[in-house]
């Protein structure tokens, strides 16, 4: 089941972050580093009730952050949709031990948007994060633009891609 995360989930979440970083390294993807995402990011997400986990028999196999906080660099993009009130997907990871975890979490985000009458979902990823790009395309997201960003955690030497989906 997918549910809101709580503080008891933090250890599992940080372990999933480590696993995700290892997978990213296999793709020469340096999107996540020692500072991002940090435990403090997830504590804030839990407090804001925006972090969801995929929990199967009390084991956490993935997480996703769904909120309405758009990165400031989104303002530099000419979006073909109205971004007001859009959901934004941040920090998504699924365990190698649960095939399809990221897909289930992404479908949950779309279902949550429908449930709350949200008509647009925005997200972004690093140019080297091919698995995320494939997931976005699988769900019918459209790539809008790519932006070079010069501040942490986005200063990675390659652009970030911005995506949207009308719901």
Name each region found by the language model.
Residues 123-133:
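Conserved beta-strand-loop-alpha-helix junction that forms the acyl-donor binding cleft
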